[in-house]
UniProtKB/Swiss-Prot annotation:
Lineage top rank: taxon: Eukaryota
Domain I-EGF: 471-495, 499-547, 548-584, 585-625
Name this polypeptide is given: Integrin beta-8
Record gene name: ITGB8
Oligomeric form and interacting partners: Heterodimer of an alpha and a beta subunit. Beta-8 (ITGB8) associates with alpha-V (ITGAV) to form ITGAV:ITGB8. ITGAV:ITGB8 interacts with TGFB1.
Record InterPro entries: EGF-like_dom, Integrin_beta_N, Integrin_bsu, Integrin_bsu_VWA, Integrin_dom_sf, PSI, vWFA_dom_sf
The organism of origin for this protein: Oryctolagus cuniculus (Rabbit)
Disulfide bonds listed in the record: C47-C65, C55-C469, C58-C83, C68-C94, C211-C218, C266-C307, C407-C419, C439-C467, C471-C491, C471-C494, C481-C494, C499-C528, C511-C526, C520-C531, C533-C546, C553-C567, C561-C572, C574-C583, C585-C609, C593-C607, C601-C612, C614-C624, C627-C630, C634-C661, C640-C657
Segments forming domain VWFA: 146-384
Length: 768
């Protein structure tokens, strides 16, 4: 155990009193002293003023707190004085070898490394609350991966032309992919939608042929059918595609996500290889149903994310919901599958918007009859192998990961953002920082997985939580048990035979804070005059009288003490760097409340999460600096009055005006009589009357002019037919009366009609 402090075999904690006196012990003590020389005053006061009454509580306060286990240390004083930074404990007289101070270790086994792309494959970290550990993860892409490409095609009627194009893509695509892979395989599957109403027509005449509107013979609708497993035989792939018939449904969205999840999790059916780069090509021209859409058909059972293929047919299509985007993303990442959405038409942008929610996916727009399908696949694959991103899975409660990518060009990006334009000769580094704010309920040894998206290798991070002390682990005997029982409900219970006689006679004595309070606050049992607190599902109950707990503190955004502190006696005890009644505010936020004079909120308010809340209702402004009606408003700004008349002022005063009085508002004062004459109501009445009269008169004139103009045009149009009475000659009108007579004769008879001229006043008639 001594060697762990010197960087030799790792140990769970530094326990100096377990080492024998000698050079090793001296070096160990020197290491502890050098470790704590740089501690700040904030941690010093935090450890010393924490009122921690057990070693575990002390170590949970922060990475710099230590606990003195020496029996004679501060004899007669409060137990909380045993908790402090190591340098203070030593100065108070605690022997160096009696200080509990867990250390942080990162161990990377050099032997048995099997990974070739992601190294190291395993990392072992020992953490304590508030501490952080750091290591580098290296990712080196291979030059030529084996590639498994599975075509998942929407075979609804609108995709008829695109399916015909698939008959000829096999050989051409295989030739193009040979440049990137020496081992290329193809597979094929089809999907439509759930085979229930309202997604398909259940009319007896259309149940087996949904394409009657297209005058086509279609196969029955189906949720997902696995047609061909991954194979190197391109001819077999083309034959399977050639035999494929289209199907149909009646609503616009399809069941694509349902089929994608089955293609991802049914590894043995599809034939996914562990060592291959797995590509899932989804061809469609419509959107896909999302989770909860199935409720329209009365399907309410959530998707369980498991494989349900029977005879290559998805048999749970009509009984389970569509998967959610989060569930689909999880299954794709777990199975190292990259998705290429090949979309035709206006729905391309719908899939493009989903890319941030589905890591490792690419969307491309296919042309009419899928003319550019092969080029789309090749370009998408080039982009996928040139991107390196990681994701942390199986997070341990209370343990957080911060990942920063160091790209080959020197750029630093967040882990989820990753690096682009990476070649097979490049190496991408990821700086991984692991922190533990508090110990999880499970405790012990846990692990997390760092998984590069689309890679078949991972890095497993073993996390050992140093949340206890050796003094507690080696505790034994009645005396130790009685000493620790009130402080830790996990302490073994004392046997009745170990109790002193006087304690056995009054078992509840010492288990009440006051006589009128229940035994152990009603949340524990009294054993040997000491409270043993109950274990509760809500959290931990502790304290001498079980009066404290870690679950009755305020919540912030659904987390107890915002996840940045621990609950003690109903109050949040914030971790280092956080403050507030719910530990919701960073400590550094207080600097945003300081004005130019160094005052917090100008002395008129309090700083809450980096924002000033003015306590004086008359104060306004970001720093509560404006208070026009405050008694001190004039005295505070009196020196700025002379800045309003800058004539004959010295340069020093002018400089002061520019700096200190630049924000002063200069009000504009208008000189006016204090008394105003009463308005003349009679004058206002006449003005309104005259204006109204003139407007009405104007309307009448306009209407009159329109009527005259209309009459004039009417008279003019009838003047052509007016007969002048001055003419002596009578007007002779020529009238013509015709009648068509048809005779069936070989030689029609000629008829002569003589139309005489009639006077205008005579009546004209035709007699036949």
């Amino acid at each position: 155990m001594c060697g762990s402090a010197l960087g030799l075999p790792p140990a769970a904690f530094v326990r100096l009193r377990s080492c024998r006196p000698g050079p090793a012990a001296f070096l160990r003590a020197a290491w502890v002293l050098s470790l704590v020389l740089g501690l700040g005053r904030s941690e010093n006061s935090r450890c010393a003023s924490s009122h921690a009454v057990s070693c575990s509580e002390c170590l949970a306060l922060g990475p710099d707190c230590g606990w003195c286990v020496h029996e004679d240390f501060i004899s007669g004083g409060p137990r909380s004085e045993r908790c402090d930074i190591v340098s203070n404990l030593i100065s108070k007289g605690c022997p160096v070898d009696s200080i509990e101070y867990p250390s942080v270790h990162v161990t990377i086994p050099s032997e048995n490394e099997v990974n070739t792309q992601v190294t190291p494959g395993e990392v072992s970290i020992q953490l304590r609350p508030g501490a952080a550990a750091n290591f580098m993860l290296k990712i080196h892409p291979l030059k030529k991966y084996p590639v498994d490409l599975y075509y998942l095609v929407d075979v609804s009627a609108s995709m008829h032309n695109n399916i015909e194009k698939l008959n000829s893509v096999g050989n051409d695509l295989s030739r193009k992919m040979a440049f990137f892979s020496r081992d290329f395989r193809l597979g094929f599957g089809s999907y439509v939608d759930k085979t229930v109403s309202p997604y398909i027509s259940i009319h007896p005449e259309r149940i087996h042929n949904q394409c009657s509107d297209y005058n086509l013979d279609c196969m029955p609708p189906h949720g997902y059918i696995h047609v061909l497993s991954l194979t190197e035989n391109i001819t077999e792939f083309e034959r399977a595609v050639h035999r494929q018939k289209i199907s149909g449904n009646i609503d616009t969205p399809e069941g694509g996500f349902d089929a994608m999840l089955q293609a991802a999790v049914c590894e043995s059916h599809i034939g996914w290889r562990k060592e291959a780069k797995r590509l899932l090509l989804v061809m469609t021209d419509q959107t896909s149903h999302l989770a909860l859409d199935s409720k329209l058909a009365g399907i309410v059972v959530p998707n369980d994310g498991n494989c349900h293929l029977r005879n290559n047919v998805y048999v749970k299509s009509t009984t389970m919901e569509h998967p959610s985007l989060g569930q689909l993303s999880e299954k794709l990442i777990d199975n190292n599958i990259n998705v290429i959405f090949a979309v035709q038409g206006k729905q391309f942008h719908w899939y493009k918007d989903l890319l941030p929610l589905l890591p490792g996916t690419i969307a491309g727009e296919i042309e009419s009859k899928a003319a550019n399908l092969n080029n789309l696949v090749v370009e998408a694959y080039q982009k996928l192998i040139s991107e390196v991103k990681v994701q942390v899975e199986s997070k341990v409660p209370g343990v957080y990961f911060n990942v920063t990518a160091i790209c080959p060009d020197g750029a630093r990006k967040l882990g989820m953002e990753g690096c682009s334009n990476v070649t097979s000769s490049d190496e991408v580094l990821f700086n991984v920082t692991v922190t533990m704010e508090k110990c999880s309920v499970t405790g012990g040894k846990n692990y997390a997985i760092i998984k590069p998206i689309g890679f078949n290798e991972t890095s497993k991070i073993h996390i050992h939580q140093n949340c206890g002390c050796e003094c507690e682990a080696s505790r034994g005997g009645a005396a130790k048990c009685a000493e620790e029982a009130p402080l830790d409900s996990t302490c073994p219970q004392c046997q009745e035979s170990q109790c002193h006689q006087e304690e056995a006679q009054s078992p509840s004595q010492g288990c009440k804070a006051h006589e009128d309070q229940p035994v152990c606050s009603g949340r524990g049992v009294c054993v040997c005059g000491k409270c043993l607190c109950h274990k509760m599902k809500l959290g931990k109950v502790y304290g001498k009288y079980c009066e404290k707990d870690d679950f009755s503190c305020p919540y912030h955004h659904g987390s107890l003490c915002a996840g940045h502190g621990e609950c003690e006696a109903g109050r949040c005890q914030c971790f280092s760097g956080w403050e507030g009644d719910r530990c919701q505010c960073p400590s550094a936020a207080a600097q945003h409340c300081v004005n130019s004079k160094g005052q917090v909120c100008s002395g008129r308010g309090t700083c809450v999460c980096g924002r000033c809340e003015c306590s004086d209702p008359r104060s306004i402004g970001r720093f509560c600096e404006h208070c026009p009606t405050c008694p001190t408003a004039c005295s505070e700004n009196w020196n700025c009055v002379q800045c309003l008349h800058p004539h004959n002022l010295s340069q020093a005063i002018l400089d002061q005006c520019r700096t200190s009085c630049a924000s002063m508002e200069q009000p504009y004062v208008e000189q006016a009589s204090e008394c105003f004459s009463s308005p003349s109501y009679l004058r206002i009445f006449f003005i309104i009357f005259i204006v109204t009269f003139l407007i009405g008169l104007l309307k009448i004139l306009i209407i009159r002019q329109v009527i005259l103009q209309w009459n004039s045009s009417k008279i003019k149009s009838s003047s052509d037919y007016r007969v002048s009475a001055s003419k002596k000659d009578k007007l002779i009108l020529q009238s013509v009366c015709t009648r068509a007579v048809t005779y069936r004769r070989e030689k029609p008879e000629e008829i002569k009609l003589d139309i005489s001229k009639l006077n205008a006043h005579e009546t004209f008639r035709c007699n036949f």
